[in-house]
């Protein structure tokens, strides 16, 4: 059942998709992060979106 309400889609994207993933340990970090919260690596990438 897909979400059709644009307001709910925006909330979903903000809460689930707008993250950075550490390439070293796989931890999820906020988009504003420059270093990983778990291992302090600077090797971060944006989470892939379908």
UniProtKB/Swiss-Prot annotation:
Q: Name one GO biological process term.
A: translation
Keywords from UniProt, A to Z, are: Ribonucleoprotein, Ribosomal protein
Q: Which SMART domains match?
A: Ribosomal_L40e
GO molecular function list: structural constituent of ribosome
Question: What Gene3D superfamilies does the record tag this protein with?
Answer: 4.10.1060.50
Q: Which GO terms describe its cellular component?
A: ribonucleoprotein complex; ribosome
Query: Where is the chain membrane-spanning?
Result: none
Q: Do the record's keywords include Nucleus?
A: no
Q: Where are the coiled-coil regions?
A: none
Give the PANTHER family listed for this entry: 50S RIBOSOMAL PROTEIN L40E (PTHR39649), LARGE RIBOSOMAL SUBUNIT PROTEIN EL40 (PTHR39649:SF1)
**HAMAP family listed in its UniProt record:** Ribosomal_eL40
Q: Which family does it belong to?
A: Belongs to the eukaryotic ribosomal protein eL40 family.
> What name goes with this protein?
Large ribosomal subunit protein eL40
Q: Which gene encodes it?
A: rpl40e
């Amino acid at each position: 059942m897909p979400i059709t309400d644009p307001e709910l889609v925006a909330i979903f994207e903000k809460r689930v998709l707008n993250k950075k993933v550490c390439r070293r340990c796989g931890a999820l970090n906020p988009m504003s992060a420059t270093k990983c919260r778990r291992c302090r690596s600077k090797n971060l990438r944006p989470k892939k979106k379908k």
